[in-house]
Every structure is written in C-alpha cells, then in structure tokens.
C-alpha cells in the first residue's frame, strides 16, 4: 500500500512538473486548417499501409488532416496539458471527416493539446473549421488522374471562398502529387494572412491529382 501511494505521488508531481515546462497550452496566434486530398495520400502511402481510409466505400475526397495552433513564427506541439485525452468514441466520431480514428488521436496529441481546449471542444472546433471552408466540387467530378499546377487548386478554393485571399492559403505537393491545402484562420475561424513559415506553395507545374475512388 505504501509503495502504491508513493508511486501515485511520484506521478502527480511528475505531471505538475510537466505542466510547468514546455510550450503553454492555449498560447498561440492563429490556426492552420490542413485539408488533404485522400486519393492522393492513398496512392502515395495509404494503399501500401492497407489503410481502410482508402477503401472506395468511404468516397473520401478532401479530408481534415488537422487544425493546428500556430505562432506568427513557428508552432507549438505536444503541449503539456491537464485536459483528459479523447475517448475511443470521440476519435471514432471524427472518422467521417478525418478518415481514421488514428489520425484524430494523433492530431489531438500533437496539436489539440496546444489549443487550450478539451478534446471534445477541440474536435468540435475542428469540425466547424472544416465546414467553414467550401471545398470545390469540381475535384469530385474527375474520372481519371490528371496532372495540374498547384495554382489551379488554389484558384478553385479562392473562387469557392470569397473571403479568402491568396496570402491566406497555400497548396503543398509531395512525391509528385498535390498533397494538401492549408488555410490560415483566426481563433474565431475567420480567414487571416498566413505567416511566412506556413506558405509552402508547390512550384511544380504538373503534379498528379487522382480521382475519387
């Protein structure tokens, strides 16, 4: 009994020390909303992993990679927090927009802990941010893989979201594929200019873009 009590005290003081060090949860300047085109991720690595996200029955297009707290320069991650981690039920409820409960868990652990929110509130805000940005329907109409410049993707999002300006969005590519669209949002989820470290515009003129499965 004495050793159990001692172990509990060690854990409590260790947790208190962790909260006293590192990046402070809830202290950041704005959010980055990251959207990933699921068919491209599946072609690059998801199929090789046997990810259920890539099964055609899900009909995934733009999924929510994450909602990331951001500084004007740099970003926090894995922040010490007293907030309880999400339950399995919570992460499963995010599968419809995040593709997998595993991604939802990872995003909470790396980014949600820095939001200052509870897991439930972080997921609710993430869903709200996802719904706030219109995803151009034109990409769901593709019936075969195409090659296109990232600028085409960016322009489609700008046209679909009148409140967005070019300095509020960036499109990334990876291994020859369009990878992600990232939109910078205020704490109230209004579009704001991105910091220079967020802007990573893909300069390739012919990145692959796969159709919905």
Roles of regions detected by a PLM:
Residues 20-44:
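N-terminal module-boundary/linker segments of secreted carbohydrate-active enzymes
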Residues 1-4:
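Positively charged n-region of N-terminal signal peptides that target proteins for export
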Residues 6-15:
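Bacterial N-terminal signal peptides
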Residues 32-34, 46-213:
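Domain-level detector of nuclease and nuclease-like folds
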